Curated annotation (Swiss-Prot):
GO terms for cellular component: cytoplasm. One of its GO terms (molecular function) is RNA endonuclease activity. Its EC number is 3.1.-.-. Belongs to the endoribonuclease YbeY family. This is Endoribonuclease YbeY.
Length: 155
């Protein structure tokens, strides 16, 4: 896990049930394992009010969400690439985990993987993009010994 530097900011009232940094590194490493650069990612874990504010300011959506990704993708010095920031909402992730009957760890993994793929340029603005991203998320989750998060549709 030498090719990743993760900075974590804990910015919520209750830090209980947040995965350890080692887990975030393991999940992100699965995606970046073939990258030769040292990749830097900041993860900020927040409450609903902060993610709602960010979602409105950057996406004009006045509601909380589980994750926001802010890609940067610039070299800050030789072989050091600042990929960007992930802002994860602890409360939303916990609620979704219960709602969709997923283990909390698995859902944290999925949302982190989803956000990291956004940092790398993947998106889901249309059915084709969504299918590509969901297949990749399923493959990565299975490789980490979690269940597939998506049931894929045929278009």
């Amino acid at each position: 896990m030498k090719n990743i530097i993760i900075n974590i900011q804990y910015c919520c009232k209750n830090n209980k049930n947040i995965p350890k940094k080692l887990y975030f590194k393991k999940w992100i490493q699965k995606i970046l394992c073939k990258k030769k650069n040292i990749n830097i990612i900041t993860i900020r874990i927040v409450d609903e009010w902060e993610i709602k504010k960010l979602n409105f300011n950057y996406r004009k959506k006045n509601k909380p969400t589980n994750i926001l990704s802010f890609p940067f993708n610039k070299f800050i010095k030789i072989n050091y690439k600042l990929l960007g920031d992930l802002v994860l909402c602890k409360n939303i992730i916990e609620k979704e985990s219960l709602k969709y009957n997923k283990s909390l760890e698995s859902h944290w993994a999925h949302i982190t993987i989803h956000g990291t793929l956004h940092l790398l340029g993947y998106d889901h603005q249309n059915n084709k993009e969504a299918d590509i991203m969901e297949r990749l998320e399923n493959k990565i989750m299975l490789s980490l010994n979690y269940k597939k998060p998506h049931i894929l549709k045929s278009f």
